[in-house]
């Protein structure tokens, strides 16, 4: 396909019969690509490798860099930039038509393994090597591999070994600076007697790789459903009333200062004009909390609805709480606060969730504490998202929503104390 001398830039293309979701090309009589449409039928489509001349790159790379720096286009494929570029006609890029079965694209390891049996046992992949060792099987016995939706911290994929499915967690970029995996492992060991977590098959404190059992008949919590709320809060009550003691504390002030330092030490600007004022408010909340005697027990801290797993067993659903990487000793009401802000609850919804958890009407101190942790949680995850966004991740409006919690619930906290 490639030659010693290539006179022009080109994109490989294969003919697609019938309807396709591939990127279809329109060309001039001389083969210059003049338009790209996402999806089409009975057309040549972008498929396989691409070649750029130095002259093309000299003009194209600045445009590509500008699109990457722009929030509205940062998450695009690089071909989106090309799509806009070809309409101008300069510099030129041509179609490189390939015969049928000349070019293959592989979207996953499973597709590659189906095409070339060599990769069934020689994937050259760290996760596959690990699974092979953990289960004492050849890589060819690891099947049905598919990616799961990426979380906000990690990526995971599903696989099957000996007719049973498992999940392998791969820590996301930069998480080694954010997560203490030894503490996470200790959290699982501490909470094990309650039998409320996912079943862990393998955990590596150094790499953060984790393999756990996949529950076939399961779903995540829906916090707009009052019955799901009740079951999730019942599990949190069970956790908190056990009064488990971990060797690791979740100190929200320390975490706030830690993430702030991560942002500023990497030359990142915190993009809020009133940041210093809001931070001062958060320090006041921390002082208020420290002046109030509150219990400290093992708490989950990352109590987003997706971490409550409803597993069907016969005619009942058993609730499990997964992913304990942020857990530590803390005020149990921090778990309720995190449930609220992760679910984007308003004040009325948050008050109701607190009632469900306590199984009674909260007192003034409990309302004030909930609002304080909602504000502090919002502030903490704002800094977390700012840092992660500078690592190349995109959280849409999440950062703004969390910052709004910090601002609003500071005032709600103070209003309650004045009552």
Go through each PLM region and give its residues.
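Active-site activation/catalytic loop segments of kinase-like enzymes and analogous catalytic loops
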Residues: 333-362, 375-393
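ATP-binding pocket architecture of kinase catalytic cores
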Residues: 146-253, 260, 264-277
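An alpha-helical support segment within catalytic cores of ATP-dependent transferases
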Residues: 126-141, 244-301, 305, 311-313
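Conserved alpha/beta core of the MobA/IspD/sugar-nucleotide pyrophosphorylase nucleotidyltransferase superfamily
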Residues: 45-130
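Conserved NTP-binding catalytic cores of kinases and kinase-like/nucleotidyltransferase enzymes
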Residues: 92-199, 208, 297, 311-319
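Conserved core of the sugar-phosphate nucleotidyltransferase
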Residues: 1-73
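Catalytic activation segment of kinase domains across protein kinase-like and atypical kinase folds
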Residues: 309-335
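ATP/Mg2+ or Mg2+-diphosphate-binding catalytic cores
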Residues: 110, 116, 120-123, 383-419
């Amino acid at each position: 396909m490639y030659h010693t001398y290539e006179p022009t830039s080109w994109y490989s293309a294969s003919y697609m019969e019938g309807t396709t979701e591939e990127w279809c090309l329109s060309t001039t009589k001389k083969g210059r690509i003049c338009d790209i449409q996402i999806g089409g039928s009975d057309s040549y489509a972008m498929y396989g490798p691409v070649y750029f001349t130095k002259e093309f790159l000299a003009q194209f790379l600045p445009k590509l860099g500008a699109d990457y720096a722009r929030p509205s286009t940062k998450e695009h494929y690089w071909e989106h930039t090309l799509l806009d570029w070809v309409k101008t006609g300069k510099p030129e890029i041509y179609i490189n038509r390939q015969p049928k079965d000349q070019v293959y694209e592989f979207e996953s390891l499973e597709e590659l393994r189906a095409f070339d049996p060599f990769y069934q046992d020689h994937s050259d992949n760290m996760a596959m090597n690990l699974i092979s060792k953990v289960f004492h099987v050849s890589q060819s016995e690891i099947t049905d591999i598919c990616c799961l939706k990426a979380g906000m911290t990690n990526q995971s994929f599903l696989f099957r070994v000996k007719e049973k499915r498992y999940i392998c967690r791969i820590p996301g970029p930069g998480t080694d600076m954010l997560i203490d995996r030894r503490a996470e492992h200790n959290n699982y060991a501490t909470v094990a007697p309650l039998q409320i977590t996912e079943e862990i098959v393998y955990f590596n404190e150094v790499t953060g790789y984790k393999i756990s059992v996949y529950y076939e008949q399961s779903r995540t919590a829906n916090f707009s459903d009052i019955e799901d709320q009740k079951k999730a809060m019942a599990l949190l009550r069970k956790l908190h009333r056990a009064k488990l003691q971990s060797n690791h504390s979740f100190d929200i002030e320390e975490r706030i200062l830690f993430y702030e330092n991560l942002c500023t030490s990497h030359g990142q600007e915190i993009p809020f004009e009133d940041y210093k004022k809001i931070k001062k408010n958060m320090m006041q909340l921390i002082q208020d909390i420290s002046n109030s005697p509150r219990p400290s027990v093992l708490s989950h801290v990352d109590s987003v609805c997706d971490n409550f797993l409803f597993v069907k067993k016969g005619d009942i659903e058993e609730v499990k709480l997964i992913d304990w990487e942020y857990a530590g000793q803390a005020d149990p009401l921090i778990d309720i606060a995190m449930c609220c802000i992760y679910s984007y609850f308003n004040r009325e919804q948050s008050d109701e969730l607190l009632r469900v958890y306590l199984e009674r009407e909260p007192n003034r101190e409990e309302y004030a504490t909930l609002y304080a942790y909602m504000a502090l949680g919002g502030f903490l995850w704002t800094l977390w998202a700012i840092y992660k966004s500078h690592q190349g991740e995109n959280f849409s409006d999440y950062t703004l929503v969390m910052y709004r919690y910090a601002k609003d619930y500071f005032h709600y906290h103070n209003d309650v104390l004045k009552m």
